[in-house]
């Protein structure tokens, strides 16, 4: 009569675009991501940046590259993002 269907659906992963600011670590790059936030009281649109550590398996990204990153499971104490693709190489 009653069916127990436990369909576990995975939540949508966050995807961000950012600029590589450091590539000094092995298989890790630091990406600066910009977020535009409206001030709660005054309504001004502000730019807020955050630096994220991103897993780069092939060590292919360099400083100044524009990259696409995706949220993933925790890979280390501070890494929760992985590199999806390099959108534009630095000149």
Swiss-Prot record:
Q: Name one GO biological process term.
A: translation
An annotated Gene Ontology molecular function? structural constituent of ribosome
Q: Name one Pfam family in it.
A: Ribosomal_S17
| Keyword RNA-binding appears in the UniProt entry | yes
Q: What residue ranges are annotated as transmembrane?
A: none
What InterPro entries does this protein map onto?
NA-bd_OB-fold, Ribosomal_uS17, Ribosomal_uS17_bact/chlr, Ribosomal_uS17_CS
Which GO terms of the cellular component aspect does the record hold?
A: cytosolic small ribosomal subunit
State what this protein does: One of the primary rRNA binding proteins, it binds specifically to the 5'-end of 16S ribosomal RNA.
The entry's protein name is Small ribosomal subunit protein uS17
Q: Can you name the source organism?
A: Salinispora arenicola (strain CNS-205)
């Amino acid at each position: 009569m009653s069916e127990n269907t436990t369909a576990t659906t995975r939540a949508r992963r966050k995807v961000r675009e950012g600029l590589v600011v450091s590539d000094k670590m092995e298989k890790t790059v630091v990406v600066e991501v910009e977020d535009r936030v409206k001030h709660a009281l005054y309504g001004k649109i502000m730019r807020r940046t955050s630096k994220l550590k991103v897993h780069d398996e092939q060590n292919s990204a360099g400083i100044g590259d524009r990259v696409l990153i995706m949220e993933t499971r925790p890979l280390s104490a501070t890494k929760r993002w992985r590199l999806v693709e390099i959108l534009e190489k630095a000149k």
